[in-house]
């Protein structure tokens, strides 16, 4: 195939006398011979040299890589106003292609501005572009964490490594991958991606190194926000988005949601807290219910405790603090219908937020449950209450009947933590529950500490927690339910990271913290039986064969986790003898 050399013409080069002139009489063979003579000293690629590009054969792979990097950058910088990299800008073909690519990549990622050395901790000789990270988020200890992508990545000369699963670690140096993590105590600089390779290109080939830099950038951005270094945080959040592109699966999704949340906090763009948002969350929760076992586990274990507490009762009443779409109650109604001696009269009071369109959605849920009750021959009473907050409830509103006539159970799934941002809110609700005098009070909450006073600690804990949750979703086949479930979790991340004060409602606490709250309010634990444990384990077998999920009994409570990390906890409570 012949080409007209005019279209490939570059700047004149004294090493090639005929280059840069329109000498149609010279043949390609002559040029190839001239290149061959020069190659004896420079080992230049023949075909590219004919076209006027000087590239050593040994540099071909690097040049190809840099071209890929430049192409990626050119697609990303349009909106940043870097006209010299815009796709519609003309660049004359350079002769020194390798150097030209280096210069272009350097322009895209210029050296960071001078900063106070007090931000650095043990920077050493590294020229890594993220050396402006404040505090110890990057340069902390020598025993840094490195992502264990495969055992083949370990060099033969490396020291032995110990493998462990992610738990409720709050150290800012731990890296969340959603999978197994390896602790490395040697060559820590290389492990955390601070190797002495060129820092100018932010398009990184090695996904493992990218993952390390990504998580450290997330931690550093959170630390900068806590220190009110918003200019550094702004620069880091942009790099987080760029680094996240190189990742796959759960890590990419988690990093993207956390990057959005960090950006909202930096620019003070709080997510909406409106009735429309409540309605959307309700819909998203339905998709989450269909996708994974967490809500099913919550409903099943709570129902089992309620069913046992109602044994032998002729009239029973459930007050549900988390009515939503009423997904929990068909299973309990069917179990009551099959009870030996016949079903009791079942009364249900559902409490939920107002609808965006002022429709009576709680009434609609009640009508559907009434149809089911009629079909299975259960006498059914229902009433719905609309409340902006559970703290607005009063026991007198609930039309309580004497305990000799009607046994009452109170149920709350993922609701009580939302009261912790309102002064006196949780105390008010627990006081109402005490007035109700239920035979059992079932509570399901996220098993994590997201309500501490220090932002960086909350951020670190939430990064671990949601990375594990997203990792557990990776085995689910792709579907609309899965996508919407990820959005459901992403909204929680956004609220937890971007909001403060009463707007921050995702204030999850651990079982021990809740136990202290309930104990000080006059409640004692009601242990869930071994039967609930066995049946919950059987339920999980329906999801991916139960692989990866784990049920654990802890002081009479049941925890569902992914591998060794507990994620949600079901507990049951009753009034202590003193009350």
Swiss-Prot record:
Q: Where is this region: SAW?
A: 498-574
Region of interest (Leucine repeat II (LRII)), ranges: 364-396
Q: Which UniProt keywords apply?
A: Gibberellin signaling pathway, Nucleus, Phosphoprotein, Repressor, Transcription, Transcription regulation, Ubl conjugation
Location of motif DELLA motif in this chain is 45-49
Instruction: Say which domain of life the source belongs to.
Output: Eukaryota
Q: Where is the GRAS domain?
A: 205-574
- Output a single Gene Ontology CC term carried by this record: nucleus
Identify the stretch(es) annotated as PFYRE: 408-495
Biased composition (Low complexity) is annotated at 149-162, 174-183
List every stretch annotated Leucine repeat I (LRI). Answer: 212-266
Motif LXXLL motif in this chain: where?
416-420
* Region Disordered, annotated ranges: 1-31, 149-183
Where is motif VHIID found?
A: 316-320
What post-translational modification information does the record give? Phosphorylated. Ubiquitinated. Upon GA application it is ubiquitinated, leading to its subsequent degradation.
Where would you find this protein in the cell?
Nucleus
GO BP annotations listed = gibberellic acid mediated signaling pathway; hyperosmotic salinity response; jasmonic acid mediated signaling pathway; negative regulation of gibberellic acid mediated signaling pathway; negative regulation of seed germination; regulation of DNA-templated transcription; regulation of reactive oxygen species metabolic process; regulation of seed dormancy process
Family note: Belongs to the GRAS family. DELLA subfamily.
Q: What is known of its domains?
A: The DELLA motif is required for its GA-induced degradation.
Q: What is this protein called?
A: DELLA protein RGA2
Biological source species: Brassica campestris (Field mustard)
